[in-house]
Every structure is written in structure tokens, then in C-alpha cells.
Amino acid sequence: MPDAPVGPRPHAFATALPPAVLSLVLGLWGVRRGGALWRDEAVSYDMAHRSLPDLWATLGQADAVHGLYYLLLHGLFGVFGGADPLLVLRLPSVLATAVASGTLALLGRRLAGARAGLLAGVVFALLPPVQRYAQEGRSYAVVCMLVVWASYLLVRAVETRSRRVWAGYAAVMVAACLLHEFAVLAVVAHLFALPRSARRTGLRVAAVVCGCLAPLAVVSMGQSEQVAWIGGVGGDLVGFSAVTVLGLVCAVLLRRDPPARRGPLPGFAPALLVLPAFLLLLSTPFKPLFVDRYVLYGHAGAALLVGAVLDRSLRARGRIRAVAVLATGAALLVLLPVGVGLRTPQSRADDVTAVAEAVRAAGSDGDGVLYMPARRRVWSLVDPGSVRGLRDLALERGPAASHTLYGTEVPAAGIRVRMLATARIVVLRDPVSQPLDGTAQERVKRRVLAAYFVECGTRRVQGARISVYARPGRC
């Protein structure tokens, strides 16, 4: 990789600190989201609170791809169990995003100069997807941090040819891949961006990373039903495409500069932005796998490119500089309401806390409860007290006892018998717009409710319907 543009180079600390502090402030702003929790975070919470033997047994059947993250959360809750559970759940992501923003600034500093790096870190911290996952109790922000850190080490390894730095790169990438195996796509992007002189070493290191990932990949391939919910490209792709187009436009602008001036960034950043997402999209005709959070680290590539263009514009004089300042101000005005919206319960697919409150208000001791579909039992994992006194009419074994995410259910005939022996049932369902599951258990739930019960009332909360059904005349 060629040298970055030559110029005054402030201390690295001065470059990294402002983006890191900005990211930390944004991450702490509204981090509790009004006490709301959505279903993926509920899974994280439940898995983190299982015993280590139960957790290990569950990972053998489901969610092995997130196993290391659940183990991390298990340790944190063991140490800080008396603290606010939402903070314990989300602070790792807040801190990881702050570290990623600061590290990205250092990476940009090496690739394009100090101011370009600082601006890249600030842009990264402000991107809506980055703000979103900075406040989620899932692994994606931590994976993003590790990929950004590995990218920094990769640039240093190429510059110094140090085996120790190459080993550090390999170790960090292995950690990222063990937290989420799609981080391995960043290795492909890194290989693509390497200069020819470093590719042989890069290939050897990539082989080590893939070898360490292989056991997890084999296990998770046997759990492919975990991603069966991905129905194809949709809204996720629209948002990611907008960021990608912005980044690629910036890359084109940067390539207009002579090589000695533009530095290595226009060759490095587009690969990180485009390749991982493109490789996921290639699988769509056979098995849809693209979800924007799986390649959240690609936004680091976009931020590097935008930061470099902003730096280039600020070096210019007259109209170009004025346009850059106005465009930046307009972008900040647009991002403010987006940021506010991300910190509301309505920003997520559902609200487990609101569901629990609605169930507690609707149910009475002795009532039955049905989850339609069965995986919506996740809504009761965090607050089992909301269904205490209610009889789960379909349940065979609970999530922890069955070493599954949502528990196992009795056969359809057993569900029918239990429903017919119950006078009043609280039903937890998806919104009307969601497709219906076609399993025998789900079909019999719908048929018995339609034939033998009447709907007494329905309360709608974010991402869910809580209905009360009773025998005719018993509402």
C-alpha cells in the first residue's frame, strides 16, 4: 500500500478521541429505549441467564453462531447481575462502537491523513445503522469493532512486514469470526485490497482464520433453519444500497486525484464496503442470507470514503468548500430526527416489554395461553411473571429444559384436546400483515379458535397482537 498523503500529523490520540467520545455519547443517549426490548435481545438475555451446561447443550442444537457472545453476556450478568439488565445487555455494544469509531479514525489517519481519519470516525459514529446496533444486546457492534481493529492491524502489517502484527491481525479476525461467522467475508475484502507483495502472506493468514472458523461453520451449517426466516432482499438492501452508492461516489471522486495525493484509501475502503455484502447477495437465488447487520462493518468502508472526500473538500477553496459545509449541515439536520426515532420502542420489530404488560392485563389465573407461532414464546422469556398463572396449552418442554430457543410443543392432537378443555385463552400473535405458519400445530390452533371460541377483544402493541378468546357467552 502506498503512503498516505504527507502533511502535519497530530498525535494519534487527538485523532481517535473525538469520534470515540461522540460515539459513546450517542450510544448512551436513550440507551434504555424507554425500557423496551425486542425479541432478538430477549433471546440474548435468556441465553445469558442459562447455566453453562444448559447453554452448551442449547448451542449444540441452535444459535451456535452466537455462542461466544452469549458466553460473554453470561459472564457480564454473573458479575453485574444486580445492575439494570438493559444496561448490562447493551453497554458492550455501546463501548464496542465507541472503540470502533476511534480505531476507524486511526485507520483513516494511516490511509489518508489525520483530518480525513477524524472525519471518517465522526461519520461512522453518526450513521443510523451504526447508532442502531450500538444500542442492541446482540453481537454485531462487537464484531464490527473487531473487523475495524483487524483492518487497522492489516494496514500496519503491510507497512511493517512484522510477523507479530500479522499474528495480531489473525487473532482479532478469528475472534470476530467466532462471534459471527459472516465476519469471514471481511477477510475476502482484505485479501482483495492487499498489494501484490503481501498477498502470499495474506493468503496464509486467511487460511489460518478459516481453519479456526471451520468447526463452528460445520456446526452452524446443521442449524441452517435458524436463517429460514430470511425471505429475500427487502428494506435492508435499500438502506445498505444508499450507503454503498454514497461510498462509491466518494471513491470515484477520490480517484480523480493523482496517486501520490490520494493515498491507498480509495483502493482499500471500497472492498470493505462492497465485497462482503455482494458475496451474501450472491446466495440469494439459492438461500437468502443478506441482512444488513450481518455486514455492519461494511459501513466502516463508507465512512472512510466520506471522511476522505470531506477532507478533500475542506482543503479546497471557494464554492467547493462552501458546498461541503452546507451539505454536512443538511445531513446533520436530516440525521437528528432519525436518531431520535432509533431510540423509541417503535424503531424495532416488536416490544417484548409492552407485550408482557398487555398479557398481564389480559390474563387471569387459570386461563390458557397460546403463542402463534410457537417462536413467539420469546415474548415471555424476559418476564415469565407476565404469564404466571396461565397454562401454556401447547408446551411440551420449556426452552431451557428442551435446550432450544423457544421450547417444544406437543403434537397437534394434544393441543386440540387442551384447548377444548379450556374456557378462556390469551393468544399472542404477529400483526395481521405477517404470513401464517403452516405446521400442523399452528393449523390446529387456528381451526379450534375459529370453530369453538369467539374473540372477546384484541390489544395491539408494537409488533404484536394480544387477543382474548372465550367460549361463546363467556367473554
Mark where each language-model region is.
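Terminal, non-globular segments
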Residues: 2-475
